[in-house]
Amino acid sequence: MTKKEERDAKLPPKSNFSEWYHELLRSAEIVDVRYPVKGMSVWYPFGFALRSHVYQIIKELLDVDHYETQFPLLIPETEFMKEAEHIKGFEDEVYWVTHGGRDPLDIKLALRPTSETAIYPMLKLWIRSHADLPLRIYQIVNTFRYETKHTRPLIRLREITSFKEAHTAHATWEEAAMQVEIAIQRYIEFYRRLAIPCLVSKRPSWDKFPGADYSIALDVIMPDGRTLQVGTAHLLGTNFAKTYEITYEDEHGEQRYVNQTCYGISERCIAALIAVHGDDKGLVLPWRVAPVQVVIVPIIFGEREPIIEVCRSIASTLAGRNIRVRLDDGDERPGAKFYKWEMRGVPVRIEIGPRDIKNGVVTIVRRDGVRKTLPMDERLVDAILIEAEELQTVLYNRAKEFMDSKIKLVSSLDEARSQVQSGVARVPWCGSVECGHALEDQIGANLLGEPRGDELPPMRCLVCGRESTGSTYMARQY
């Protein structure tokens, strides 16, 4: 962004969420939406650095027992069309390659909307016996979906640039079901490290992943009360194994179908990070993922060079402890620098002026507004790391308090209709498909599914009146 663009950038208040979000993506240089294909954005270098630090967390969590791999982007139509239920869920969203140069292709090639139909023909070749199981792999790739709805950067795209999809194969259905639980727990931990609490629910049968036995999803409540699905895990059972003939020889020499799972996260996790923690000044980033963790701003009064030398020394010390630090020694006024780095969400700002040097201290300002004086000696780095941990705790607690404030157990359809205008309604539900569809129609919101592990005392389904301990989250969704 040019200096003129920076001066002209005026961030709307976060209460005007849609405008705030789109302007912040530009002003903080996360993604540029001006690419000349609708629904496809370009990562700015700063935004891509943020993305890299975020995805490093999920890689660390998966690398414990998964192997990273990469499969081709193009999927032959003959493989893609094999799984009828799966294809029914994606057929209107597929981009097709029909020509190579000027020559029509004998077999059309799909740009992957997701990779089951690319990966599973290979698993048939890789898996031979029970000794090959469990198999756990993942890839981080781009996927393409012809979205006809209103596109939103990082939220609803035609090119998903950062799709992390894991695929596993197991000997039994029970082992696959356990893998789904492990996946959900790792996703919860992933978002905890981003200081983001999530709703976890089992999706209704009509909203499960095409071809799955069942689906579990994570949702984040956005500032306007809508929910954003930010992760899913699916138990596929033997459905795809039967289609692609993925079998193994068991201990008794018998051929059996594998049981499979798949689970994924996209750059929606970046959208959630921005939306949940950001404020009227811009991004607010947790320490772990901030491209710049500490910015040092010299406060120049009198002679410049002695102050700059002290700042350089502190920057060198911080960098020596693997802290991502930036010394902003440009000609702008301190206030302009504060504005710029607050917009980019830097967790800790250090201010150093002549008085600080004289007193042997530095002034630090955390991105949540906490201001402290710390000693300018060997204790400084550890003191800053403590502040980083405190900021993480503050961000999570603040986000959890907001999420809890947006969820309400309702006892009537009118109350539910009112609640979903600005939050999530927890609605008594008997669990039937008929009543589920009726709830969606009468409340005017999406049925997210049954909350995990939190039964209600007996209440009556708001549609049929039958007594039930079941319930569902309902919300307007992105």
Curated annotation (Swiss-Prot):
One of its GO terms (biological process) is prolyl-tRNA aminoacylation. It holds the Pfam family ProRS-C_1. It catalyses: tRNA(Pro) + L-proline + ATP = L-prolyl-tRNA(Pro) + AMP + diphosphate. It is found in: Cytoplasm. One of its GO terms (molecular function) is proline-tRNA ligase activity. Its main location: cytoplasm. It comes from Methanothrix thermoacetophila (strain DSM 6194 / JCM 14653 / NBRC 101360 / PT). Homodimer. SUPFAM superfamilies: C-terminal domain of ProRS, Class II aaRS ABD-related, Class II aaRS and biotin synthetases. The keyword Transmembrane does not apply. This is Proline--tRNA ligase. Its EC number is 6.1.1.15. PROSITE patterns: AA_TRNA_LIGASE_II. The gene is proS. Catalyzes the attachment of proline to tRNA(Pro) in a two-step reaction: proline is first activated by ATP to form Pro-AMP and then transferred to the acceptor end of tRNA(Pro). The keyword Aminoacyl-tRNA synthetase applies.
